[in-house]
């Protein structure tokens, strides 16, 4: 039997995440929802995705995150051929960072 993650429960979770207004709210929500270990694991996976996007080697990523080569390979696969979520957020954050940096120079 195949498990599907797209259902009413996860739709509700996605709406809850979208309701968060700032990093402080997100931290509170994540801490109530997940264990410290789970949050740390997700943080490591996110760091790996960003490093893979910068073409940083698996060895370096493993050293900085502690993730296994298998997990890094999965993240790489999802970054390249997944639903596009990693790429969407990386690009959006990079665009936001660049626009914020250029605005600082105008002040």
Write out the residue ranges for each language-model feature.
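Short alpha-helical "recognition helix" segments of helix-turn-helix
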Residues: 60-65, 72
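Short, amphipathic alpha-helical "recognition" segments used to contact nucleic acids or chromatin
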Residues: 42-56
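DNA major-groove recognition helix of helix-turn-helix
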Residues: 76-79
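Residues at alpha-helix boundaries and the short loops/turns that link adjacent helices
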Residues: 20-24, 36, 55
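Short, Lys/Arg-enriched anionic-surface-contact patches
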Residues: 25-45
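Intrinsically disordered, low-complexity basic tails/linkers immediately adjacent to helix-turn-helix/homeobox/MYB/SANT
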Residues: 89-107
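General nucleic-acid-binding
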Residues: 1-20
